[in-house]
Every structure is written in C-alpha cells, then in structure tokens.
Amino acid sequence: MIGRLRGSLAEKQPPHLVLDVNGVGYEVEVPMTTLYRLPHVGETVTLHTHLVVREDAHLLYGFYEKRERELFRELIRLNGVGPKLALALMSGLEVDELVRCVQAQDTSALTRIPGVGKKTAERLLVELKDRFKAWEALPGTFTLVSNGPNQAEPVASAESDAVSALISLGYKPQEASKAVSAIKEKDLSSADLIRRALKGMG
C-alpha cells in the first residue's frame, strides 16, 4: 500500500496530477478540494494517498489532508459508492461541510452533486450518520510545503481544463461549458474556474 507521496509536482491536469518522486512519475487523481490547494508546478508537495488495485490497473488517489483520505475510505465502503462518486462528493463539499450535511440530514446539498439523486442522498446520509463524529475528530495534520497562488495559465487552456474537469465529475458537456463561460472574471486559473463553476451550479 502506498500511503503517502512526497515529490515535485510535474503536471497538473484536473482532476489528475503527476508527482515526480525521485525520477518516478506517479499519476494521482485528486478531488477538486485538493486541487485548489496545490502549489505551482515544479514545487514540492506531499499527498496522503489511497491505492486501488484492479485486474487492469493500479489507481492512486491523493488528498491534501489525512482526514480527507480517511473520509474517502469511509465513503467507498458504503453500498453503491465507488471512487468516482466519492471524489465527486468530496469535490463538491469540504469535509466539514459534508459533516454538517450529515448532522442536519440535508439532502439538498448532496443532490447538487452529479449522480446523486434524492433517494441516494437520503440513503447516504443515513449510512453516514453513525460515522461523522469520528471524521469530525480527525486532526488536520497535513500541510503543504507551499500554498502560494496558482501560476497564470493561458485563458483558453484554463477554460478547457476546467470544462474537462467538470465533465469528469459527471456534469454534461453542455452544462460544464455553460458554467465556465458564465464566469465573468478574467485571467483565472483552471482551479479557480472550477471552484466558481461548482458554486454557480450549486
């Protein structure tokens, strides 16, 4: 099991990144909440990781904080929740926000996530109710080496990356494109575009 990786951020293509660890490039899929906090390409970063072994692939998932990884592991234990849906949930809601949803049994927040209908949201909240106290108590012990602003990206490239990331989360291409195009602010990074688009679609 690969539990943690520390290396140079070689590539950042939402929702994937490549981490160069002593000359070996590890492709890692991350939730948007982790993507927002990544340093510049070329800088050092540490990620808490979870490895999923399948017959046809070994898949690595990375997280900014250790408690995010623990939440991911709990989510994929739930009936009908695989890594894709777990990442979508964690991309739409911060850990503390998800805990509050469970406390309040708030289905509306979950149904805004692609692939989560009302019945699924109700079931997830019931199953999560007994676990949120443990998550709430998990310490946030992980800190990135650098948390500076994102590097400037070409506008067309940033918008394209943002649309691709939203599609990977389950949004329809037309929805993703419309949400990104609706953002009036200029010269935003792909991470900022994704964040604003998700809020707009919420």
From Swiss-Prot:
GO terms for cellular component: cytoplasm; Holliday junction helicase complex; Holliday junction resolvase complex. Residues 1-64 are annotated as: Domain I. Residues 144-153 are annotated as: Flexible linker. It comes from Pseudomonas syringae pv. syringae (strain B728a). Homotetramer. Forms an RuvA(8)-RuvB(12)-Holliday junction (HJ) complex. HJ DNA is sandwiched between 2 RuvA tetramers; dsDNA enters through RuvA and exits via RuvB. An RuvB hexamer assembles on each DNA strand where it exits the tetramer. Each RuvB hexamer is contacted by two RuvA subunits (via domain III) on 2 adjacent RuvB subunits; this complex drives branch migration. In the full resolvosome a probable DNA-RuvA(4)-RuvB(12)-RuvC(2) complex forms which resolves the HJ. The keyword Acetylation does not apply. InterPro entries: DNA_helicase_Holl-junc_RuvA_I (IPR013849), Hlx-hairpin-Hlx_DNA-bd_motif (IPR003583), NA-bd_OB-fold (IPR012340), RuvA (IPR000085), RuvA_2-like (IPR010994), RuvA_C (IPR011114), RuvA_C_sf (IPR036267). Belongs to the RuvA family. Residues 154-202 are annotated as: Domain III. It comes from the Bacteria. It is found in: Cytoplasm. GO terms for molecular function: ATP binding; four-way junction DNA binding; four-way junction helicase activity. This is Holliday junction branch migration complex subunit RuvA. Transmembrane segments: none annotated. One of its GO terms (biological process) is DNA recombination. The RuvA-RuvB-RuvC complex processes Holliday junction (HJ) DNA during genetic recombination and DNA repair, while the RuvA-RuvB complex plays an important role in the rescue of blocked DNA replication forks via replication fork reversal (RFR). RuvA specifically binds to HJ cruciform DNA, conferring on it an open structure. The RuvB hexamer acts as an ATP-dependent pump, pulling dsDNA into and through the RuvAB complex. HJ branch migration allows RuvC to scan DNA until it finds its consensus sequence, where it cleaves and resolves the cruciform DNA. Has three domains with a flexible linker between the domains II and III and assumes an 'L' shape. Domain III is highly mobile and contacts RuvB. Keywords: Cytoplasm, DNA damage, DNA recombination, DNA repair, DNA-binding. Residues 65-143 are annotated as: Domain II.
